[in-house]
A protein has these predicted regions:
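N-terminal secretory signal peptides
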Residues: 21-68, 73
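General alpha-helical segment detector with a strong preference for membrane-spanning helices
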Residues: 6, 53, 92-94
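A generic structural signal for short, solvent-exposed coil/turn residues
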Residues: 12, 42, 53, 78, ...
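Bacterial N-terminal signal peptides
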Residues: 2-15
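Small side chains
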Residues: 13-15, 52, 117
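Sec/Tat signal peptide C-region and signal peptidase I cleavage site
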Residues: 16-20
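Active-site-proximal loop/helix of nucleotide/amide-processing enzymes and allied scaffolds
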Residues: 21-22, 72-85, 89-177
């Protein structure tokens, strides 16, 4: 999938990719999460929506919807001509959740909708969920986005830069998720 290659190239410092529309999605995602993360953390709720293209072909996003602890269902993406991905936050840090990784349910939900996903974590990580390959990719690490001051680094153990579906299931089960 082209967007994953572009995003990984940006994340790995490979310079400016040729597809500006894909880097514009990444830039938009970061701006959206920079605004949502502090609210999500302070209210300890997930916030979610969709990203895609409007009728003019511009990268756009739907208004974020407030969810609950551990879940969020976005509004219908009527304003988007094409939906490319979901986005959501994971709320405040909690030792009771494996919230530094996209969940298996996050990945399965995006796959069921036929789209990819973006996930922001309480530690300030940004993840990309590629449902065509059923992998998650760490786009930027701790503190890349606003982080919960109560976040405890390392409570989920070592976080790898990517996971395939089966490895994600195993990781979450191993840490008690």
């Amino acid at each position: 999938m082209k967007i994953v290659s572009v995003i990984l190239a940006v994340a790995l410092g490979a310079g400016n990719p040729a597809w500006a529309q894909d880097t514009s999605e990444l830039q938009l995602v970061k701006r959206v999460f920079e605004q949502l993360q502090p609210i999500s953390i302070s209210k300890n709720r997930e916030y979610c929506g969709y990203i895609g293209r409007d009728a003019a072909g511009n990268v756009a996003f739907t208004k974020a919807r407030r969810g609950r602890k551990g879940t969020c269902v976005p509004r219908d993406p009527d304003a988007l001509a094409v939906v490319t991905a979901s986005y959501h936050t994971h709320g405040a840090y909690s030792p009771n959740y494996v919230n530094e990784l996209p969940s298996v349910e996050d990945m399965e939900g995006d796959e069921a909708e036929g789209i990819d996903g973006w996930v922001a974590t309480p530690g300030g990580r940004l993840w990309y969920v590629d449902t065509q390959e059923m992998t998650i990719h760490l786009i930027c690490d701790l503190g890349c986005l606003p982080a919960d001051p109560a976040f405890v680094e390392g409570d989920t153990g070592e976080i790898l830069p990517s996971y395939r579906y089966k490895a994600l299931v195993q990781k979450i089960e191993a840490v008690g998720g």
